[in-house]
């Protein structure tokens, strides 16, 4: 039994030691390299110096470097806030440049369009001539027709198959500046922008309406602007960063990209607005690669820049644009016909056939593709039906909107058999006809805009074709179609799809064995800070947690210094542009990012302050770690991996830290209040005596109120037995008070019970003993309170006495056990001491004997060696004798 008690005691002691030294507590680290996905607005920087471009973006200083990270991150070009912001912002740029702003509801009227006036310019005869000239027999394909820089038809604008623009002259009456007087106006429309009613052939006029007139969002351009594309880059606000997947195998979606770099800004990109093709992109390389949507067949194909693919468009003619004042503050621009207008057209240069062949080969090698491997069965096709922007290749040239019919180009690139096509499409050419529209469908939002007629003079645009927008479809592995697409937004998924925006989260939580302590008496190793800039501390993102914690102080300083530096740079450029930023959409975004970094830093410090860790790099907390089975591998885990593991615990840990800090503040407050009692002089302070007087008054008032309540209860109990005045004295407490009546006053008539005397003395009851009665009642009350308190204390003592006795007995037993154990230890120690002494004596004796024997042996050996010469001499002497 005693042995069992000893074992139990040892187990309890070991568990206590384990509970003290092995409990892990929450530790807060500030300056760790971790992040999470973010969706805040980015700001734009550009080197373009034209007015509207600099109004929209901040000046670009070109100092943006990338830093490689040893981490794995997921990337998606379609679920990406960077690409979504680019699409929205480029649309804002587009509208700012082209400016459709005046609603055209006054022009939704009936117009009289003169057919003979239109025919006089040959605007309709050419089309009918071409239509009727088609033979009805088996069609014959025309000879391949190509143009280049030296072709004469380029300069003369008379290449084969090009026509005149189909236009119609119309008149309409409207009320002008005078409300009661109408005025007739002339206007020339593109035939595709009008809807006319068919009338008899003898009538030269037709009733026509502007197309899409019932659409409420139709707007006319206030002013004619060029849509010159600009190159710009996106930059993250301070406290945020841009990660980029640097893997050459990245195809728009990669859940585990291991080649990640970080920067504060993206690469330069181009503001492209076109269907089918992407122009002047910045992602072209000496290879062809594909961005493929993760869930459907949408793709954006980057073309190999080795083939030098170009597209050059031209709008010939000498048009004149005149303003027509409809009413005050509303001007509509008309284009009278001064010369025979010619059709716009575009021609394609470079090794297009080789480029498309490489595109097909790249599709076959793509892991998402499961169609035929025969590139001859992969065809480049035009979409069928839909809006004009889908059916035609739509682009913008110097502010004009070109719609190009691409059949000739597709026939040329694919070497198609044109014998089965319609007569007008039966050509294989490297140029295509285009026409200009005033009413276009908006590419970003549902709606239509009306723009000014084309500007005067020749218009020429030269572009480099860098990408191809297409949907790839295949059926049964026999045929694959590369269908050209009108998704303008895909261009920006190619430009910025390898980026993702993240928010730096420098606060990390991890379990350690250290509890909260004060650092007032401790010393710190001073460490020199090597400022890498704001993103420098992310270089340790791929390092283990233990290695990062060593440098967390330097990293937190680097983080703050980088935020302040980046904030100052942004503030400087905003100051330089403040006059131009007042009326722009992006100006508001830029000003918004100006305060983001400081807000983020203050938010982090407020959170640290709520935990009692303000301005500390490593802060130990008294809160135990809530999940003992979840601990970091300090030598292998990175902070980013550890943050993902404990993400589900973060909310719970945060609540525990706040509760612990609140309790800590309460304890400090109570401790400070107790500090005022440690000085004896404070007990006699005037403020203290005022409090004592208040406490005394409270006691007196309480006793009085209690007595009143008791008296009322007693009176109510007496009333149940019979009536007696509440304030009358108890029985037998009466004293007669004699009063002398004035003889001059009339004598009061006798009453019943007066005794028949009308004399001068009378008596009435007075409660003179009532005060004595109250005193006795108060004494009785105090006696009752004293007896009850004494009874309560005696009962408490009686209840606690067995517990105290058992506790005392337990303590005695523990003391006996400890004394027994101590006796055992003392006996064992004495036995051990005696054994050591005996061993020492035995060893000493043994060593002494061994040393004597050894010394004797050495002495004899020495004597024998010393005797050798003497023996030799003696031998020689004997020999000589």
From Swiss-Prot:
Region described as V5: spans on this chain: 477-484
Extracellular side: 23-696
Gene: env
Parts of the chain on the Cytoplasmic side: 718-881
Note: This is a macaque isolate.
Motif Di-leucine internalization motif: positions: 880-881
Region (MPER): 673-694
Gene3D superfamilies: 1.10.287.210, Human immunodeficiency virus 1, Gp160, envelope glycoprotein
Protein's name in the database: Envelope glycoprotein gp160
Purpose: The surface protein gp120 (SU) attaches the virus to the host lymphoid cell by binding to the primary receptor CD4. This interaction induces a structural rearrangement creating a high affinity binding site for a chemokine coreceptor like CCR5. This peculiar 2 stage receptor-interaction strategy allows gp120 to maintain the highly conserved coreceptor-binding site in a cryptic conformation, protected from neutralizing antibodies. These changes are transmitted to the transmembrane protein gp41 and are thought to activate its fusogenic potential by unmasking its fusion peptide.
Keyword tags: Apoptosis, Cleavage on pair of basic residues, Coiled coil, Disulfide bond, Fusion of virus membrane with host membrane, Glycoprotein, Host cell membrane, Host endosome, Host membrane, Host-virus interaction, Lipoprotein, Membrane, Palmitate, Signal, Transmembrane, Transmembrane helix, Viral attachment to host cell, Viral envelope protein, Viral penetration into host cytoplasm, Virion, Virus entry into host cell
Region listing for V2, in residue ranges: 170-213
Disulfide links within the chain: 44-57, 101-222, 108-213, 113-170, 235-265, 245-257, 313-346, 397-461, 404-434
Motif extent (YXXV motif): 723-726
Coiled-coil portions: 636-668
Entry domain remark: Some of the most genetically diverse regions of the viral genome are present in Env. They are called variable regions 1 through 5 (V1 through V5). The 17 amino acids long immunosuppressive region is present in many retroviral envelope proteins. Synthetic peptides derived from this relatively conserved sequence inhibit immune function in vitro and in vivo.
Transmembrane residue ranges: 697-717
Region Disordered, residue ranges: 737-761
PTM description: Specific enzymatic cleavages in vivo yield mature proteins. Envelope glycoproteins are synthesized as an inactive precursor that is heavily N-glycosylated and processed likely by host cell furin in the Golgi to yield the mature SU and TM proteins. The cleavage site between SU and TM requires the minimal sequence [KR]-X-[KR]-R.
Molecular function GO terms recorded: structural molecule activity
Annotated region (V1), positions in chain: 113-169
Carbohydrate-modified residues: 37, 70, 114, 148, 158, 173, 186, 200, 204, 214, 246, 249, 280, 286, 297, 308, 318, 373, 379, 462, 478, 627, 636, 652
């Amino acid at each position: 039994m005693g042995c069992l008690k000893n074992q139990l005691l040892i187990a309890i002691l070991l568990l206590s030691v384990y509970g003290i030294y092995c409990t892990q507590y929450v530790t807060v680290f500030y300056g760790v390299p971790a992040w999470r996905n973010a969706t805040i607005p980015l700001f734009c920087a550009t080197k373009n110096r034209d007015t509207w471009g600099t109004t929209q973006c901040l000046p670009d200083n070109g100092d943006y470097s990338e830093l490689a990270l040893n981490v794995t991150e997921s990337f998606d070009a379609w679920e990406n806030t960077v690409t979504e912001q680019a699409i929205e912002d480029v649309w804002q740029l587009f509208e700012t440049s082209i400016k459709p702003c005046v609603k055209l509801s006054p022009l939704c009227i009936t117009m009289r369009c003169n057919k003979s006036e239109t025919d006089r310019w040959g605007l309709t005869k050419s089309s009918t001539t071409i239509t009727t000239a088609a033979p009805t027999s088996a069609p014959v394909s025309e000879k391949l027709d190509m143009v280049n820089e030296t072709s004469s038809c380029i300069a003369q604008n008379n290449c084969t198959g090009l026509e005149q623009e189909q236009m119609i002259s119309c008149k309409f009456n409207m009320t002008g500046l005078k409300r009661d007087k109408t005025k007739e106006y002339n206007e020339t429309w593109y035939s595709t922008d009008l809807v006319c009613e068919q009338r008899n052939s003898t009538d030269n006029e037709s009733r026509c309406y502007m197309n899409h007139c019932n659409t409420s969002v139709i707007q006319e351009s206030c002013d004619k602007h060029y849509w010159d594309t600009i190159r710009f880059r996106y930059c993250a606000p301070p406290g945020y960063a841009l990660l980029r997947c640097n893997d050459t195998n990245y195809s728009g979606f990669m859940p585990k990209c291991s080649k990640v770099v970080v920067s504060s800004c993206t690469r330069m990109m181009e503001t492209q607005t076109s269907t089918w093709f992407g122009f002047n992109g910045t992602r072209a390389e000496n290879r062809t690669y594909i961005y493929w949507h993760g869930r459907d067949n949408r793709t954006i194909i980057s073309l190999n820049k080795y083939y030098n693919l170009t597209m050059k468009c031209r709008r010939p003619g000498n048009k004149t644009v005149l303003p027509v004042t409809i009413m005050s503050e509303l001007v509509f621009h008309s284009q009278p016909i001064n010369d025979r207008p010619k059709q716009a057209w575009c021609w394609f240069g470079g090794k297009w056939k080789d480029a498309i062949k490489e595109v097909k080969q790249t599709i076959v090698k793509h892991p998402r593709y499961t169609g035929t491997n025969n590139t001859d069965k992969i065809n480049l096709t035009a979409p069928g039906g839909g809006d004009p922007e889908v059916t035609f290749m739509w682009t913008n040239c110097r502010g004009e909107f070109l719609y190009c019919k691409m059949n000739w180009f597709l026939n040329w690139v694919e070497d198609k058999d044109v014998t089965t096509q319609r007569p007008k499409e039966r050509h294989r050419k490297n140029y295509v006809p285009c026409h200009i529209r005033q009413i276009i469908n908006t590419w970003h939002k549902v709606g239509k805009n009306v723009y000014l007629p084309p500007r005067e003079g020749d218009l020429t645009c030269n572009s480099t074709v860098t990408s191809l927008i297409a949907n790839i479809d295949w059926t049964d592995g026999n045929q694959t179609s590369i269908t050209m697409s009108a998704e303008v937004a895909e261009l920006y998924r190619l430009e910025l799809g390898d980026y993702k925006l993240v928010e730096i989260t420098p606060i990390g939580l991890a379990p350690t064995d250290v509890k909260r302590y004060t650092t007032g008496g401790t010393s710190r190793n001073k460490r020199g800070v090597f400022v890498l800039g704001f993103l420098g501390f992310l270089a340790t993102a791929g390092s283990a947690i233990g290695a990062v914690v060593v440098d967390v102080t330097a990293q937190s300083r680097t983080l703050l210094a980088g935020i302040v530096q980046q904030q100052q740079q942004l503030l400087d450029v905003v100051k330089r542009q403040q006059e131009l930023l007042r009326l722009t959409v992006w100006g508001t975004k830029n000003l918004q990012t100006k305060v983001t970094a400081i807000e983020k830093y203050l938010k982090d410090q407020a959170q640290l302050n709520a935990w009692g860790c303000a301005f500390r790099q490593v802060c130990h907390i008294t809160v135990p770690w809530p999940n003992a089975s979840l601990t970091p591998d300090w030598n292998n885990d990175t902070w980013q991996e550890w943050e993902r593991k404990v993400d589900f615990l973060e909310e719970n840990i945060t609540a525990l830290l706040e509760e612990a800090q609140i309790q800590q503040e309460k304890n400090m407050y109570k401790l400070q209040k107790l500090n005022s009692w440690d000085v004896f002089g404070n007990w006699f302070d005037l403020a203290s005596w005022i409090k004592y007087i208040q406490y005394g008054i409270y006691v007196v008032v309480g006793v009085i109120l209690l007595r009143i309540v008791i008296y009322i209860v007693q009176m109510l109990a007496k009333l149940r037995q019979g009536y007696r005045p509440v304030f009358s004295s108890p029985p037998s407490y009466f004293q007669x008070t004699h009063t002398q009546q004035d003889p001059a006053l009339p004598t009061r008539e006798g009453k019943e019970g007066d005794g028949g005397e009308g004399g001068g003395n009378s008596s009435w009851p007075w409660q003179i003993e009532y005060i004595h009665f109250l005193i006795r009642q108060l004494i009785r009350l105090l006696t009752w309170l004293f007896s009850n308190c004494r009874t309560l204390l005696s009962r408490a003592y009686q209840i606690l006495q067995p517990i105290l006795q058992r506790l005392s007995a337990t303590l005695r037993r523990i003391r006996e056990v400890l004394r027994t154990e101590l006796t055992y230890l003392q006996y064992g120690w004495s036995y051990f001491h005696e054994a050591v002494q005996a061993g020492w004596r035995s060893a000493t004796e043994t060593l002494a004997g061994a040393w004597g024997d050894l010394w004797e042996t050495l002495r004899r050996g020495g004597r024998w060696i010393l005797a050798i010469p003497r023996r030799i001499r003696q031998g020689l002497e004997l020999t000589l004798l």
